[in-house]
UniProtKB/Swiss-Prot annotation:
UniProt GO BP: base-excision repair
Protein name: Putative 3-methyladenine DNA glycosylase
Top-level taxon of the source organism: Bacteria
The UniProt record lists the keyword Hydrolase: yes
Keyword Iron applies: no
Membership in a protein family: Belongs to the DNA glycosylase MPG family.
Any one GO MF annotation of this record: alkylbase DNA N-glycosylase activity
EC code(s) of this entry: 3.2.2.-
Amino acid sequence: MEAMITKEFFESKTTIELARDILGMRLVHQTNEGLLSGLIVETEAYLGATDMAAHSFQNLRTKRTEVMFSSPGTIYMYQMHRQVLLNFITMPKGIPEAILIRAIEPDEQAKQQMTQNRHGKTGYELTNGPGKLTQALGLSMQDYGKTLFDSNIWLEEAKLPHLIEATNRIGVPNKGIATHYPLRFTVKGSPYISGQRKNSIRTGIWK
């Protein structure tokens, strides 16, 4: 097992830095069926009170967003279109910023169980989207409020991307200037990026 990411790592960085720096890290979920895991290849940063695209815009505090005001490394799960999405809180208590995990590259030894969790989906379809990866990993709303440092979900050091690309976030229309923030970060060339074009897929994406 590689070195696990600590709370101190989260506390030493901004939300945007974290969204970039966790690319290539291994996301692990310990389940009754064993360890399910993959390398993070796509994230989005959400900047809280000043970000119209964030659930916590203007410090909106509801039953759903309450956990966003918790400490760094807390897990924020929410449902959208029958899918469950995974986010990590990034800033000190009271500053509701987060990272959405949008895609992972599944680890080979976990693919069989992850394929079962995805009802037979294989190839890039296995984990090339935020709802797909949570289903593949067996994550659910029951993981809301856990932390990455004392639960069955954690991050490990793994690989470093050759190139990271920053683009507009997906699915945030009509959010004023926030619609155009370049806060989506991807490992350039990864076939598992959501909506990836075939002619954009590259080999040798890791250092």
